[in-house]
Amino acid sequence: MRVIVQRVLSASVASGDESAVHIGPGLLVLSGIAPADDQAALGWMCRKVVNLRIFDDEAGRMNRSVKDIGGEILLVSQFTLYSDVSSGNRPGFSGAAGYDIAKPLFEKFHQMVQQEMERPVATGWYGEHMQVALVNDGPVTLIIDSPTRS
Protein backbone atom coordinates (compact mmCIF):
# COMPACT_ATOMS: atom_id res chain seq x y z
CA MET A 1 0.00 0.00 0.00
CA ARG A 2 1.19 3.49 -0.78
CA VAL A 3 -0.17 6.74 0.60
CA ILE A 4 0.60 10.40 0.26
CA VAL A 5 -0.20 12.18 3.50
CA GLN A 6 -0.63 15.95 3.43
CA ARG A 7 -1.10 18.09 6.52
CA VAL A 8 -3.92 20.47 5.65
CA LEU A 9 -5.79 23.44 7.05
CA SER A 10 -8.75 22.28 4.94
CA ALA A 11 -9.50 19.88 2.10
CA SER A 12 -12.45 18.81 -0.01
CA VAL A 13 -13.38 16.31 -2.68
CA ALA A 14 -16.22 16.46 -5.20
CA SER A 15 -17.42 14.20 -7.98
CA GLY A 16 -20.08 14.91 -10.58
CA ASP A 17 -23.49 15.36 -9.00
CA GLU A 18 -22.31 14.27 -5.55
CA SER A 19 -22.20 16.86 -2.77
CA ALA A 20 -18.65 17.90 -1.94
CA VAL A 21 -17.08 16.46 1.21
CA HIS A 22 -15.07 18.93 3.33
CA ILE A 23 -12.71 18.66 6.29
CA GLY A 24 -11.02 21.24 8.48
CA PRO A 25 -7.51 20.95 9.93
CA GLY A 26 -6.09 17.44 9.64
CA LEU A 27 -4.84 15.08 6.94
CA LEU A 28 -5.60 14.50 3.29
CA VAL A 29 -4.58 10.91 2.55
CA LEU A 30 -4.29 9.80 -1.09
CA SER A 31 -4.32 5.99 -1.03
CA GLY A 32 -3.13 3.41 -3.56
CA ILE A 33 -3.60 -0.35 -3.26
CA ALA A 34 -1.15 -2.89 -4.74
CA PRO A 35 -2.12 -6.43 -5.80
CA ALA A 36 -0.23 -8.04 -2.89
CA ASP A 37 -1.77 -5.83 -0.19
CA ASP A 38 -3.58 -7.61 2.61
CA GLN A 39 -5.13 -6.94 6.03
CA ALA A 40 -1.68 -6.69 7.61
CA ALA A 41 -0.60 -3.96 5.18
CA LEU A 42 -3.86 -2.08 5.78
CA GLY A 43 -3.49 -2.33 9.55
CA TRP A 44 0.12 -1.16 9.46
CA MET A 45 -0.77 1.81 7.26
CA CYS A 46 -3.82 2.69 9.33
CA ARG A 47 -1.80 2.86 12.55
CA LYS A 48 0.98 4.79 10.81
CA VAL A 49 -1.36 7.45 9.36
CA VAL A 50 -3.39 7.99 12.53
CA ASN A 51 -0.34 8.12 14.81
CA LEU A 52 2.07 10.15 12.64
CA ARG A 53 3.35 13.00 14.78
CA ILE A 54 3.37 15.78 12.18
CA PHE A 55 1.43 18.48 14.05
CA ASP A 56 3.17 21.04 16.22
CA ASP A 57 3.13 20.88 20.00
CA GLU A 58 3.31 23.93 22.28
CA ALA A 59 7.07 24.23 21.60
CA GLY A 60 6.54 24.26 17.82
CA ARG A 61 7.95 20.74 17.33
CA MET A 62 6.22 18.08 15.24
CA ASN A 63 5.11 15.98 18.16
CA ARG A 64 1.33 15.53 17.90
CA SER A 65 -0.83 13.23 15.78
CA VAL A 66 -4.07 14.02 13.98
CA LYS A 67 -5.84 12.13 16.75
CA ASP A 68 -4.03 14.17 19.43
CA ILE A 69 -5.19 17.48 17.95
CA GLY A 70 -8.77 16.31 17.28
CA GLY A 71 -8.15 16.78 13.55
CA GLU A 72 -10.00 15.26 10.64
CA ILE A 73 -8.97 12.87 7.87
CA LEU A 74 -10.09 12.81 4.24
CA LEU A 75 -9.25 9.53 2.45
CA VAL A 76 -9.17 9.59 -1.35
CA SER A 77 -8.44 6.52 -3.49
CA GLN A 78 -5.77 7.09 -6.13
CA PHE A 79 -4.57 4.13 -8.21
CA THR A 80 -2.16 6.44 -10.08
CA LEU A 81 0.18 6.28 -7.07
CA TYR A 82 1.35 3.01 -8.61
CA SER A 83 2.14 4.52 -12.00
CA ASP A 84 5.20 3.40 -13.97
CA VAL A 85 6.82 5.99 -16.23
CA SER A 86 10.12 4.18 -16.77
CA SER A 87 9.35 3.41 -20.41
CA GLY A 88 7.91 6.05 -22.69
CA ASN A 89 5.92 9.10 -21.71
CA ARG A 90 2.53 7.56 -20.99
CA PRO A 91 2.18 6.09 -17.50
CA GLY A 92 1.29 2.45 -17.01
CA PHE A 93 -0.70 1.30 -14.00
CA SER A 94 -0.02 -2.44 -13.84
CA GLY A 95 1.46 -1.95 -10.35
CA ALA A 96 -1.97 -1.00 -8.98
CA ALA A 97 -4.50 -3.57 -7.85
CA GLY A 98 -7.54 -3.95 -10.10
CA TYR A 99 -10.93 -2.54 -9.13
CA ASP A 100 -12.33 -5.86 -7.82
CA ILE A 101 -9.38 -6.29 -5.44
CA ALA A 102 -8.71 -2.66 -4.54
CA LYS A 103 -12.23 -1.40 -3.83
CA PRO A 104 -12.99 -3.76 -0.92
CA LEU A 105 -9.48 -3.20 0.49
CA PHE A 106 -9.91 0.59 0.32
CA GLU A 107 -13.30 0.27 2.03
CA LYS A 108 -11.71 -1.89 4.75
CA PHE A 109 -8.91 0.68 5.14
CA HIS A 110 -11.53 3.42 5.56
CA GLN A 111 -13.29 1.34 8.21
CA MET A 112 -10.01 0.67 10.05
CA VAL A 113 -9.03 4.35 10.07
CA GLN A 114 -12.46 5.28 11.46
CA GLN A 115 -12.05 2.70 14.23
CA GLU A 116 -8.54 3.94 15.06
CA MET A 117 -9.72 7.58 15.04
CA GLU A 118 -12.82 6.63 17.08
CA ARG A 119 -14.99 8.86 14.88
CA PRO A 120 -16.17 9.25 11.28
CA VAL A 121 -13.55 9.76 8.57
CA ALA A 122 -14.43 11.49 5.30
CA THR A 123 -13.82 9.80 1.97
CA GLY A 124 -14.26 10.32 -1.74
CA TRP A 125 -15.96 7.93 -4.17
CA TYR A 126 -13.93 4.88 -5.14
CA GLY A 127 -13.25 4.61 -8.88
CA GLU A 128 -14.82 7.96 -9.72
CA HIS A 129 -13.25 10.99 -11.37
CA MET A 130 -12.88 13.48 -8.52
CA GLN A 131 -11.81 17.04 -7.95
CA VAL A 132 -9.64 17.40 -4.85
CA ALA A 133 -8.86 20.77 -3.28
CA LEU A 134 -6.64 21.46 -0.29
CA VAL A 135 -4.85 24.14 1.64
CA ASN A 136 -1.54 22.46 2.50
CA ASP A 137 -0.14 23.42 5.90
CA GLY A 138 3.62 23.79 6.04
CA PRO A 139 3.72 22.32 3.49
CA VAL A 140 4.06 18.91 5.08
CA THR A 141 3.76 16.05 2.57
CA LEU A 142 4.90 12.46 3.20
CA ILE A 143 5.03 9.47 0.86
CA ILE A 144 4.65 6.21 2.79
CA ASP A 145 4.88 2.63 1.52
CA SER A 146 3.78 -0.27 3.68
CA PRO A 147 6.57 -2.74 4.41
CA THR A 148 6.99 -5.54 1.88
CA ARG A 149 5.66 -8.78 3.29
CA SER A 150 7.01 -12.19 2.29
UniProtKB/Swiss-Prot annotation:
Organism of provenance: Chlorobium phaeobacteroides (strain DSM 266 / SMG 266 / 2430)
What Enzyme Commission number does this protein have? 3.1.1.96
Instruction: Name the predominant localization.
Output: cytoplasm
**What protein family is recorded?**
Belongs to the DTD family.
Motif mapping: Gly-cisPro motif, important for rejection of L-amino acids = 138-139
Q: What does this protein do?
A: An aminoacyl-tRNA editing enzyme that deacylates mischarged D-aminoacyl-tRNAs. Also deacylates mischarged glycyl-tRNA(Ala), protecting cells against glycine mischarging by AlaRS. Acts via tRNA-based rather than protein-based catalysis; rejects L-amino acids rather than detecting D-amino acids in the active site. By recycling D-aminoacyl-tRNA to D-amino acids and free tRNA molecules, this enzyme counteracts the toxicity associated with the formation of D-aminoacyl-tRNA entities in vivo and helps enforce protein L-homochirality.
Describe, as the record does, how this protein assembles with itself and its partners. Homodimer.
Q: Where are the transmembrane segments?
A: none
In Pfam terms, one family for this protein is: Tyr_Deacylase
The protein's name? D-aminoacyl-tRNA deacylase
What are the top taxonomic ranks of the organism?
A: Bacteria, Pseudomonadati, Chlorobiota, Chlorobiia, Chlorobiales
Where does the record place it?
Cytoplasm
Keywords from UniProt, A to Z, are:
Cytoplasm, Hydrolase, RNA-binding, tRNA-binding
